[in-house]
Swiss-Prot record:
Gene3D superfamilies: Bira Bifunctional Protein, Domain 2, Serine-tRNA synthetase, tRNA binding domain. The keyword Ligase applies. This is Serine--tRNA ligase. It catalyses: tRNA(Ser) + L-serine + ATP = L-seryl-tRNA(Ser) + AMP + diphosphate + H(+); tRNA(Sec) + L-serine + ATP = L-seryl-tRNA(Sec) + AMP + diphosphate + H(+). ATP binds at residues 261-263, 348-351. It comes from Solibacter usitatus (strain Ellin6076). Its main location: cytoplasm. It is found in: Cytoplasm.
Length: 424
């Protein structure tokens, strides 16, 4: 959500920056509403001045003993016009808020201009992809061969885009969750929270999923409950309609949750394996900061997510998304992409974004310094997506005999050094 007065006063500049996102943005509608609102306010102010003047004249005439019935009738008519104009302004303001809620965030000036993922810019790379003495397998072949991943039974139980983990596969998923949380809480300074896995519509509006992305979500019938698409939603909304003390900032929270997505717009993409699922697990990092801190804190949060991959010895690259590839709520986003040898490409494993005050304004999240309060900036990112990290380990650490070496950092959590074939 944008600040109305800032948007109005900087319309041309902001419209130019928004145009770099591409797509249809109803800026003409904003201008038309603004003219309508200004006209109604101007007319109301003129009528109020006239009403005040008429009231003074009536008072004078009364003191002189003159008949003021007609003048009073005119004043009442003016008052009715003022009420009607005030209602018109109120209606326009509601339309403004609805229109503003559908306008994406303004891209930060450091974001490269572009139309698609092809225009994203790589900013750094860590680790070199391993060279295998054999043809590396994709996880959708390797997992079932090891007996740790079962797609057929998952389809029987539920349907497509679900997976069933067995034995060491399930333990590896659990080990990753615990490893992520331990590093972020003990090394990176985050406070762990365990939020509800369902939220209401107000929470989804606050973080920007509603109303635009309703089709990507799962709604519980006959209720206002929705399954969360990411822990970003409940964790950000912890402070909805609250004012933090300035000295508290930055507040750094992390949470493990399952996530649920309909993947309505992903038909034909990542149809094999567990890259794109209706249900998956993720550890999310969320920060609440002062505006002047937020881009430093975005860089730190991104580094915290990257650190997990470094500790696991997984090759990755980090790219800054161009204006045309960013999510609508974000002002700047870094994607961290892990190397998957079985697929011979890099795949997103974390998306780290600064929303500036966009979410905070929608959710009413403020901070106070002295007597002054203003909207906080919110930042979040995956730290990391658990299933995709599982895939990266299986594919990068596979051996010629079909076994998988467990990264050293995970061995205390797995109580093992290698995953060998199991037979469920």
């Amino acid at each position: 959500m944008h600040d109305l007065s800032h948007f109005r006063n900087n319309f041309e500049k902001l419209a130019e920056r928004l145009a770099t996102r591409g797509g249809a943005i109803n800026l003409d509608g904003f201008r038309d509403l603004d003219l309508k609102r200004r006209s109604a306010i101007s007319q109301a102010e003129q009528l109020k001045a006239r009403k005040n003047q008429e009231s003074l004249e009536i008072g004078k005439l009364k003191r002189e003993g003159a008949d003021t019935a007609e003048r009073q009738k005119e004043v009442r008519a003016i008052a009715d016009q003022i009420v009607a104009l005030d209602e018109q302004v109120k209606t326009v303001d509601e339309e403004f808020q609805k229109l503003l809620s559908g306008i994406p965030n303004i891209p930060h000036e450091s974001v490269p201009v572009g139309k698609s993922a092809d225009d994203n810019v790589e900013v750094r790379r860590s680790g070199e992809p391993a060279k295998f003495d054999f043809e590396p397998k994709a996880h959708w072949d390797l997992g079932p061969e090891l007996g740790i991943l079962d797609f057929e039974r998952a389809v029987k139980i539920t349907g497509a885009r679900f997976a069933l983990y067995w034995g060491a596969g399930a333990r590896l998923e659990r080990a990753l969750v615990n490893f992520f949380l331990d590093v972020h809480t003990q090394q990176h300074g985050y406070t762990e929270v365990l939020p509800p896995f369902m939220v209401n519509s107000a929470s989804l509006y606050g973080t920007g999923q509603l109303p635009k992305f309703a089709e990507d979500l799962f709604k519980i019938e006959n209720s206002d409950f929705w399954l969360i698409p990411t822990a970003e939603v409940p964790v950000t909304n912890i402070y909805r309609d609250e004012t933090l003390e300035g000295e508290q900032l930055p507040v750094k929270l992390c949470a493990y949750t399952p996530c649920f997505r309909s993947e309505a717009g992903s038909y034909g993409r990542d149809v094999r394996g567990i890259i794109r699922q209706h249900q998956f697990q993720k550890v999310e990092l969320v920060k609440f900061t002062r505006p002047e801190q937020s881009y430093d804190e975005l860089d730190k949060l991104t580094a915290d997510a990257e650190d997990i991959l470094v500790r696991l010895g997984l090759p990755f690259r980090t790219v800054v998304l161009c204006t045309g590839d960013m999510g609508p709520s974000s002002a700047k986003t870094y994607d961290i992409e892990v190397w998957l040898p079985g697929q011979n490409n890099y795949k997103e494993i974390s998306s780290c974004s600064n929303f500036e005050a966009f979410q905070a304004r929608r959710a009413g999240i403020r901070y106070r310094t002295g007597k002054k309060s203003e909207f906080a900036h919110t930042i979040n990112g995956s730290g990391l997506a658990v299933g995709r990290t599982w895939v990266a380990i299986i594919e990068n650490y596979q051996q010629m005999d079909g076994s998988v070496i467990i990264p050293e950092a995970l061995r205390p959590y797995m109580n093992a050094e290698i995953i060998r074939p199991e037979r469920p």
